[in-house]
Curated annotation (Swiss-Prot):
DNA-binding region of this protein: 505-595
GO molecular function, one term: zinc ion binding
Gene name in the database record: FOXP2
Subunit comment: Forms homodimers and heterodimers with FOXP1 and FOXP4. Dimerization is required for DNA-binding. Interacts with CTBP1. Interacts with FOXP1. Interacts with TBR1. Interacts with ZMYM2.
Domain observations: The leucine-zipper is required for dimerization and transcriptional repression.
Polar residues: bias regions: 1-28, 316-325
Zinc finger (C2H2-type) in chain: 347-372
Protein name: Forkhead box protein P2
Length: 716
């Protein structure tokens, strides 16, 4: 069937290629023969057609064979990668039609062809068969050659891959050998030079010692200047008559440098050797105009330790300036020993207008000594910072007075006096004990979030103020109905933005905050996790130490009866019983012992303090004024002005706080410098601050949120 279809396609194509001219001519000849013999016209025409078709098929086959022979001779040279599957297709296309014996008999019977023509056809067929055999043999040879070439190429590729792998292995081995040799060399060097590391460590230690010596000299010079300025201030106050010195004491001698094994000449020589360029003379310091006060903490790049810093014994200074100075020195030395600095934080220099990035503390010290040395630019920056501090302290004193007036208005009612309790004296005239002068007072450390207002000392002996000298003003507790309708958010809401961004502990108890969280919700009920999320969302302080304050929240929820646990679809939720909450607040004031209630006039304020406050007061004792009858109504205003000039924090002095002339103080009276406590009381019985205690009756009001449970992390 394949051969027949091939012959048909070849005949059709040859007829289309050669045209219809030959066919038409033979048809014309057949028609002429048919005219002569009409009986055999149809037979002749069919025989001629068959004969023509066979001839055309043979011619087409010969042409194809010739073309393929020429292309076959060129193909092995041009395209060696020819596929062997193309060979049988071309052979099948070239196979001509073979005449079967049956077809021969039919042709003889019909007498279409003569015997000569048949012989010619047979010869042609034999020639075609020979050509086909030759072509098949040729194509077989080509296929074998292609297979051989492919095999050779594959072998070459495998050999190349093996060679590459061998080269890579050799390179890896060489690298390993080099690394081993380097390690051996390093080990040999370490064995040969064991003292190199020790030398490097010694060099680092020497550099650190040089930096420490440089900072020590600078600190000592600053201390000298501060002492001189303090002496000038005290002399000016003495001339004005505000401070009097007992006759047994000298007139404020100038403190010399500490005896740390170095004389002033040696210290000056050491300073010149360390700095090299910036040689500092005493005259240069005086004419340089460097004005440093005790409150300028930014210019004090101190690195003194407890061994190097001298125990300075200051004399009577207005309202606790000496203790503040000592506290700052102690805190600065503590920060230096802990590899920290006031001017260094989060890898950035905090010098005003600098903000240079320092990777470690050593690099910061180099930057500080190089860029911020004692020159005109640093001196000018220091003066600007002093002015900033002065303005802020003036603003702070004004705000404190405003707060005091607000608290006086809110918590005291002069129209309804209560004669039994006596308010605390604001200013008392005391004499300084010699034993107190020998030991330098230690002040409590200050924090930025707890503003300290040193309050004038309170005697432990008989009260200096008589009932006639002070108006009998008591605090009348307001009823709950006065403030029952005012929402709690009116006290917390104004400070939301501050507490949301600043890491400051809010001045409210856990109970108050939990109640506020529940009251702010839409359905007045919250789950425990929702309360936690309200705390962290509202206050930046609660975004750390989660475990501690969460325990305190759970403790408050289970402790107080005003918080009710309700089971619903969401689970366990907490609600607030407002009546129980208000009842609890009233019981808290009436049931707890007051601080100064029913104290006889023969007892001092120290006898009524609780244990925790007494311990705090014992640590922060400071002598103040030294003569009775010194402060009067006229001098209170002068003290206020002096307090602003000294950058201090003198509290507002009541004009009625003059001492009674009839009472004389005892010879040995311990004056107490009280650090103003943070807004949150450390104990329920403790007052929220000494300002409120001094301005109010001991019966503290019940509607102050801080009087409730302390907001401390100790509740677990």
């Amino acid at each position: 069937m394949m051969q027949e279809s091939a012959t048909e396609t070849i005949s059709n194509s040859s007829m289309n290629q050669n045209g219809m001219s030959t066919l038409s001519s033979q048809l014309d000849a057949g028609s002429r023969d048919g005219r002569s013999s009409g009986d055999t016209s149809s037979e002749v025409s069919t025989v001629e057609l068959l004969h023509l078709q066979q001839q055309q098929a043979l011619q087409a086959a010969r042409q194809l064979l010739l073309q393929q022979q020429t292309s076959g001779l060129k193909s092995p040279k041009s395209s060696d990668k020819q596929r062997p599957l193309q060979v049988p297709v071309s052979v099948a296309m070239m196979t001509p039609q073979v005449i079967t014996p049956q077809q021969m008999q039919q042709i003889l019977q019909q007498q279409v062809l003569s015997p000569q023509q048949l012989q010619a056809l047979l010869q042609q067929q034999q020639a075609v068969m020979l050509q086909q055999q030759q072509l098949q043999e040729f194509y077989k040879k080509q296929q074998e050659q292609l297979h051989l070439q492919l095999l050779q190429q594959q072998q070459q590729q495998q050999q190349q891959q093996q060679q590459q792998q061998q080269q890579q292995q050799q390179q890896q081995q060489q690298q390993q050998q080099q690394q081993q040799q380097q390690q051996q060399q390093q080990q040999q060097q370490q064995q040969q030079h064991p003292g190199k590391q020790a030398k490097e460590q010694q060099q680092q230690q020497q550099q650190q010692q040089q930096l420490a010596a440089q900072q020590l000299v600078f600190q000592q010079q600053l201390l000298q200047m501060q002492q001189l300025q303090q002496q000038q201030h005290l002399l000016s106050l003495q001339r004005q008559g505000l401070i009097s010195i007992p006759p047994g004491q000298a007139a404020l001698p100038v403190q010399s440098l500490p005896q740390a094994g170095l004389s002033p000449a040696e210290i000056q020589q050491l300073w010149k050797e360390v700095t090299g360029v910036h040689s500092m003379e005493d005259n240069g310091i005086k004419h340089g105009g460097l004005d440093l006060t005790t409150n300028n903490s930014s210019s004090t790049t101190s690195s003194t330790t407890s061994k190097a810093s001298p125990p300075i014994t200051h004399h009577s200074i207005v309202n606790g300036q000496s203790s503040v100075l000592n506290a700052r020195r102690d805190s600065s030395s503590h920060e230096e020993t802990g590899a920290s600095h006031t001017l260094y934080g989060h890898g950035v220099c905090k010098w005003p207008g600098c903000e240079s990035i320092c990777e470690d503390f050593g690099q910061f010290l180099k930057h500080l000594n190089n860029e911020h040395a004692l020159d005109d630019r640093s001196t000018a920056q220091c003066r600007v910072q002093m002015q900033v501090v002065q303005q802020l302290e003036i603003q702070l004193s004004k705000e404190r007075e405003r707060l005091q007036a607000m608290m006086t208005h809110l918590h005291m009612r002069p129209s309804e006096p209560k004669p039994s309790p006596k308010p605390l004296n604001l200013v008392s005239s005391v004499t300084m004990s010699k034993n107190m002068l020998e030991t330098s007072p230690q002040s409590l450390p200050q924090t930025p979030t707890t503003p300290t207002a040193p309050v004038t000392p309170i005697t432990q002996g008989p009260s200096v103020i008589t009932p006639a000298s002070v108006p009998n003003v008591g605090a009348i507790r307001r009823r709950h109905s006065d403030k029952y309708n005012i929402p709690m958010s009116s006290e917390i809401a104004p400070n939301y933005e501050f507490y949301k961004n600043a890491d400051v502990r809010p001045p409210f108890t856990y109970a108050t905050l939990i109640r506020q969280a529940i009251m702010e919700s839409s359905d007045r009920q919250l789950t425990l996790n929702e309360i936690y999320s309200w705390f962290t969302r509202t206050f930046a302080y609660f975004r750390r130490n989660a475990a501690t304050w969460k325990n305190a929240v759970r403790h408050n929820l289970s402790l107080h009866k005003c918080f009710v646990r309700v089971e619903n679809v969401k689970g366990a939720v907490w609600t607030v019983d407002e009546v129980e909450y208000q009842k609890r607040r009233s019981q808290k004031i009436t049931g707890s012992p007051t601080l100064v209630k029913n104290i006889p006039t023969s007892l001092g304020y120290g006898a009524a303090l609780n244990a925790s406050l007494q311990a705090a007061l014992a640590e922060s004792s400071l002598p103040l004024l030294s003569n009775p009858g010194l402060i009067n109504n006229a001098s209170s205003g002068l003290l206020q002005a002096v307090h602003e000039d000294l950058n201090g924090s003198l509290d507002h002095i009541d004009s009625n706080g003059n001492s009674s002339p009839g009472c004389s103080p005892q010879p040995h009276i311990h004056s107490i410098h009280v650090k103003e406590e943070p807004v949150i009381a450390e104990d329920e019985d403790c007052p929220m601050s000494l300002v409120t205690t001094a301005n109010h009756s001991p019966e503290l009001e019940d509607d102050r949120e801080i009087e409730e449970e302390p907001l401390s992390e100790d509740l677990e």
